[in-house]
Amino acid sequence: LLISAGHTLNPNKGCGAVGFINESQENRVLAKFVVEYLKKLGCETDYHEVNIGSDYIEQQAKKANSKNYDLVVQIHFNSSDNAAANGTEVIYRSSKGKVFAQKVQDKLKTEFKDRKIKHDINDLKRNLGWLRLTNPPAILIETCFVSNKSDTDKYTSNRKKIAKLIAEGIANQTIVENSNSNTSSADKKLYAVCVTACEYDSAKKMQQELISKGYKDTYLIPR
């Protein structure tokens, strides 16, 4: 798999739209999270970005064509002069790309308005370079609208969740989050719990009470 961050960085030629969020920046943030989740699913995944260059689309396509990828994905955000425009859509050209597009769309529409999958030529009349110049099956994800406050609020408060949904759609798998996933290896060690320090008779009595409650490994240690 290849995950490509769309556009160059601002203010270079080919940079993305700027609204409530900066598309070029968020393309890179989201794409890297998607790669992270795909690797968790065991998918061999490469990441690519082109930050400057008038031929950035050709550079992106060259990377996509450099291996026999099962799928190449480019991350984008949509924009409109109409501030009310909102929702998510995945764009494709090939029949194989259409299958992947629908799987990702089915995931993203749980968070954003469903604008349906679209063929870049038949539906959008756009002949997109990413889909025109790439050899492997390819899709282009328009995550949501940078020009819509509701869309961007949903996105910025759930970046990793959105990335997880995209990864699940691409891989056709579900990621089960481990509630203890942030526990470090050091936290898996055993630790002694020291309660108090007192005279021998009191300490002995406390030890016996603890043993009677099932705490067999209870010791008296002189201080």
Indicate residue ranges for each PLM-predicted region.
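Solvent-exposed beta-strand motifs enriched in subsets of small alpha/beta binding domains
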Residues: 179-223
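Short glycine-rich His-centered loop
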Residues: 1-20
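Acidic/polar N-terminal loop/beta-strand segments that form early-domain functional surfaces
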Residues: 6, 50, 223
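Generic anion/oxyanion-binding catalytic loop in active/binding sites
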Residues: 16, 53, 192-193
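Active-site-proximal helix/loop segments of hydrolytic enzymes
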Residues: 11, 21-180
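Short beta-strand motif preference
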Residues: 3, 139-141, 193
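Hydrophobic "anchor" residues on beta-strands that sit immediately upstream
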Residues: 1-2, 70, 138, 219
